[in-house]
């Protein structure tokens, strides 16, 4: 279960941040006070839920103001009885270029415990974490939370079907890359209504969770908010779907 949730989390938070090839919009398309909630379903059963928040903070890095991004994830229902998860993540990002300065996580999954911190030095192309210093390939490397918000503010108006991009992210004491393909546009029924969406397909590694022929898809709103509303993937046994439950404090009306 832990490997599955990490895989879906990377997809949700990282799939859109295709790289520095695409310019940022003039202003972020999110704002303080935004709260998004999601549920993770295994077949017809809800296995886990997550809440993502943009919070105000007085914390500065290099004397620059930041946004605090906060994520809480936990198992639910029967899954909570057999494999209890209570994870918390924080990321502090620059208010101008939206790259991360600092990331911390508090992982509680059954008997497994992990607390980690990472300081991003973008200009020096390095990340300093609990287990050492890690070199990064570019001056834009993300944790799994900051990638999500950076990506939402990218200008993707010139994307063409079949375009592929890569994201560099720091997770589990290593720097990894994720390749994403733009698939096209589709309408998706969700708790927010029937919404026009952009569809992406990130690369996934077969193994203990995903089949060799598994395809993973993500749908984000084709509007001013760029909110992920659904993700779906087939695993070794069955399929997993991530669906949005609610969205509060959005900067723009859904569909605009």
Kindly give the residue locations of the regions a language model identified:
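Hydrophobic, well-structured mid-protein blocks that either form specific transmembrane helices
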Residues: 112-155
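Sec/Tat signal peptide C-region and signal peptidase I cleavage site
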Residues: 15-19
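Acidic, serine/threonine-rich low-complexity disordered tracts
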Residues: 20-120, 158-256
């Amino acid at each position: 279960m832990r490997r599955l949730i990490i895989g879906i989390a990377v997809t949700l938070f990282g799939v859109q941040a295709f790289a520095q090839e695409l310019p940022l919009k003039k202003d972020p398309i999110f704002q303080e006070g935004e709260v998004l909630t999601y549920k993770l379903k295994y077949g017809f059963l809800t296995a886990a839920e997550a809440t993502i928040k943009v919070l105000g903070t007085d914390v500065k890095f290099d004397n620059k103001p930041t946004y605090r991004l906060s994520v809480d994830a936990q198992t639910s229902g029967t899954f909570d009885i057999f494999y209890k998860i209570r994870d918390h993540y924080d990321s502090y990002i620059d208010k101008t270029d939206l790259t991360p300065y600092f990331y911390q996580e508090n992982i509680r999954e059954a008997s497994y415990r992990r607390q980690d911190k990472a300081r991003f030095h973008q200009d020096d192309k390095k990340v300093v974490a609990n287990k050492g210093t890690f070199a990064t390939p570019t001056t834009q490397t993300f944790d799994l939370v900051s990638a999500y918000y950076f990506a939402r503010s990218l200008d993707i108006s010139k994307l063409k079907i079949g375009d592929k991009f890569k994201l560099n992210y720091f997770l589990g004491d290593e720097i990894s890359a994720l390749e994403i393909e733009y698939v096209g546009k589709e309408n998706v029924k969700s708790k927010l209504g029937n919404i026009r969406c952009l569809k992406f397909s990130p690369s996934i590694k077969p193994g203990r969770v995903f089949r060799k022929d598994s395809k993973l898809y993500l749908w984000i709103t084709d509007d001013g908010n760029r909110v992920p509303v659904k993700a779906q993937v087939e695993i070794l046994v069955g399929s997993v779907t991530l669906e949005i439950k609610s969205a509060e404090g959005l900067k723009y009306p859904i569909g605009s």
